[in-house]
Swiss-Prot record:
Zinc finger extent (C4-type): 57-72
Function of the protein: May play a role in DNA repair. It seems to be involved in an RecBC-independent recombinational process of DNA repair. It may act with RecF and RecO.
Assigned protein family: Belongs to the RecR family.
PANTHER family documented for this protein: RECOMBINATION PROTEIN RECR
Protein name: Recombination protein RecR
GO molecular function, one term: zinc ion binding
SMART domains: TOPRIM
Signal peptide boundaries: none
Keywords for this protein: DNA damage, DNA recombination, DNA repair, Metal-binding, Zinc, Zinc-finger
Domain Toprim per the UniProt entry, residue ranges: 81-176
Organism: Shewanella sediminis (strain HAW-EB3)
Amino acid sequence: MKFSPLVDELIQSLKCLPGVGPKSAQRMAFQLLERDRKAGQTLAQALASAMSDVGHCRSCRTFTEESHCPICASNKRGQSEQICVVETPADVLAIEAGGHFSGRYFVLLGHLSPLDGVGPEELGLSLLEEHLCSGGVSELILATNPTVEGDATAHFIADMAKVHNVSVSRIAHGVPVGGELEYVDSTTLALSFNGRLPI
């Protein structure tokens, strides 16, 4: 059976979300149309507003409605000499939730992936280099994902920072707190052993 063009368009549009296949998109569309049209209208308005009004911070590239995000606009944090480099704005939220970092961020919006056409320019590394040249950065903390692409990106940025005599560190990877060793993969265990600390 074929749906009306508008229903079909809604279902197809919902499939653009990560992890949403045809069945999930259909369930979402039917939920909004059958049971919660007001929520659907609120969702549509919020989505339209976000798509037109949310851009990227001119300094760190995270999402913001202003020219600078609240962290970069902050008198205290905006002047920090530590910059944590992450792949996505979601990574910023995860680190902020921990409350252990009080410096600035730089959001790559991805990682190096030559096969996908993602090089240094697509990651905004020229802007990061401007920060490094300014003399206001003493340390880069690399918090890219522990993947082949994330590691390659971290090495590329580390080489860039060393040219400017900026200290570079990488967040530790290993066994999660509360995790059981029998469920940890061998690569993570190897990282844990190699990164062990004295007590």
